[in-house]
UniProtKB/Swiss-Prot annotation:
Top EC group: oxidoreductase
Biological source species: Zea mays
Any one cellular-component term (Gene Ontology): chloroplast thylakoid membrane
Functional description taken from the UniProt entry: PsaA and PsaB bind P700, the primary electron donor of photosystem I (PSI), as well as the electron acceptors A0, A1 and FX. PSI is a plastocyanin-ferredoxin oxidoreductase, converting photonic excitation into a charge separation, which transfers an electron from the donor P700 chlorophyll pair to the spectroscopically characterized acceptors A0, A1, FX, FA and FB in turn. Oxidized P700 is reduced on the lumenal side of the thylakoid membrane by plastocyanin.
EC number in record: 1.97.1.12
Membrane topology: Multi-pass membrane protein
Keywords: 4Fe-4S, Chlorophyll, Chloroplast, Chromophore, Electron transport, Iron, Iron-sulfur, Magnesium, Membrane, Metal-binding, Oxidoreductase, Photosynthesis, Photosystem I, Plastid, Thylakoid, Transmembrane, Transmembrane helix, Transport
GO annotation, biological process: photosynthesis
Annotated SUPFAM superfamilies: Photosystem I subunits PsaA/PsaB (SSF81558)
Gene from which this protein is expressed: psaA
Protein name in the entry: Photosystem I P700 chlorophyll a apoprotein A1
Amino acid sequence: MIIRSSEPEVKIAVDRDPIKTSFEEWARPGHFSRTIAKGNPDTTTWIWNLHADAHDFDSHTGDLEEISRKVFSAHFGQLSIIFLWLSGMYFHGARFSNYEAWLSDPTHIGPSAQVVWPIVGQEILNGDVGGGFRGIQITSGFFQIWRASGITSELQLYCTAIGALIFASLMLFAGWFHYHKAAPKLAWFQDVESMLNHHLAGLLGLGSLSWAGHQIHVSLPINQFLDAGVDPKEIPLPHEFILNRDLLAQLYPSFAEGATPFFTLNWSKYAEFLSFRGGLDPITGGLWLSDIAHHHLAIAILFLIAGHMYRTNWGIGHGLKDILEAHKGPFTGQGHKGLYEILTTSWHAQLSLNLAMLGSTTIVVAHHMYSMPPYPYLATDYGTQLSLFTHHMWIGGFLIVGAAAHAAIFMVRDYDPTTRYNDLLDRVLRHRDAIISHLNWVCIFLGFHSFGLYIHNDTMSALGRPQDMFSDAAIQLQPIFAQWIQNIHAGAPGVTAPGATTSTSLTWGGGELVAIGGKVALLPIPLGTADFLVHHIHAFTIHVTVLILLKGVLFARSSRLIPDKANLGFRFPCDGPGRGGTCQVSAWDHVFLGLFWMYNSISVVIFHFSWKMQSDVWGTISDQGIVTHITGGNFAQSSITINGWLRDFLWAQASQVIQSYGSSLSAYGLFFLGAHFVWAFSLMFLFSGRGYWQELIESIVWAHNKLKVAPATQPRALSIIQGRAVGVTHYLLGGIATTWAFFLARIIAVG
């Protein structure tokens, strides 16, 4: 770290009017790419390439500054779409929903924000969600977020929707402006210290601070009134709380003292709205809103400090290059030397790192949404709980595969082996054979042993020998490490965390269950032999996914089979004619194969979650305090055999979607059917080769010529890689939509 203050330097960071705005240029298909613009637009292949390469900025130009500007501009377009989407969500809440009714009775009324038009009899889909409202039950969690943020009327949702539209148009304008009018120079994109300072202090610091401010001044008082049963129409409007301190002081007396306790360090005065309670609010079943406000204030302070750590114009603070180059251990050669150059000149390397982090974070979010439900009445809305978990797991899986994809693109396009010697990346590449062969051994070990435990149980069960099965009732395989972690956390309050009154999550154990309106919100989750078995399946599928993706990255440039692989590019079908056995070796193919195993991994996780929660957590509680779970605790006995998974999970729980015809859930029945079809359609692309289709196309074209109806654009069979891409897309889309229909029909019917 350097501490010396010199005169601040002023740099010119933008070019004015670098590229003129031309509608004629935009109208020319493929104008952005040399290859496509020169190509032959008379074939369907050209159309496919147009779509495949439209966003592959590397293939349009080799100029890093131009690529950076395109990416930057595209980000604004992406933000515009996000604002447009959000606006649509809020508009639906304002125009087509029962939000105000739900707000008055969230335990008995389901959230709905979509009403189907009465055409061809499809109004059957508008089921009764309670309170006399007929519509489609939604499971996105928007109602819960809106209540937590203090929205009390549909008018407020309208205003927010209009605001989001204004922001969407602003983002579109910014995307055009920062490409055509004031485009940043390459140096601006590479100024990582400035970027870190602004992102940490601005986005995360001030963002969290403003959210904390909103929660304290608007959300908390409004939620206080709602929890007390005050009619939403009687509650003062948000701006009244902000402008009139006396209103807040009536709810939180310390507000009357203003900032005095802050400056006199008498901070405990603020504990009534910046609390540290832990656990769940017994009225709403969500985390305490005052805990959440406290959390965002603390996070804001951390990030505001972090955003002042890096050296920019004033010659004081950390430099990223120095930190990375100092990062060497006794056994790691040059360590991170050269990493700074990689991350400031290869956006693929940068993106890969960010996708890996974001993907992991997204999966962590999935697990926190049920174990620490952040919004009021979220925990008892089982459909939303299941949807949020499933959604965040899928998103996390895709992001992690994306991380491997861009790591491989970096290796092929941006990695320069001549300048890298003995740094960490080089050392990993030099012992890649050891890494991959060991990982392969681990996959084989995990696969045979985890599956073997199930097969043993199926065999013993089939032969009528329950006493010889691995189960909680016979040969126990208790997950002792997981139980140990649970116990540590359950016992933490008063021992390792003396300030806390309760553990971070009820799932650890130790606490009483929380029930809202006769429904279980959360209770301690027991783990047993069944969980031990399925967790080893998780370990197996995750390790295989990693094996495929990591092999793709480490062998992206070369292998014993194809030493010059880097020259063939990121995606290629085979190493040319005359070299048999070299197909499916490109880095792209590893991403393709990795996607299937990612799908396997996430499927097992969401199946496990869905069944475990229905069996051991979700359910109703009687006046006598007796809990009745949805599937009556059958997970521990049934999920220990493959047959049990098929019979008591897939088949038994599919009854709702299969029998949905003629009811308001029938759309899920149709989706279940249609998505199976989309999935099966993918196999047509995955199981047949290019030549088969070219032959077929030629005879179809002959017939068209005979009838003089041949198109001007020549049809061509998909290339091998395009066929695989279309195949994996439909495979995943069909599989995910099938699961979605199965889960939602089930949980809406029984939850």
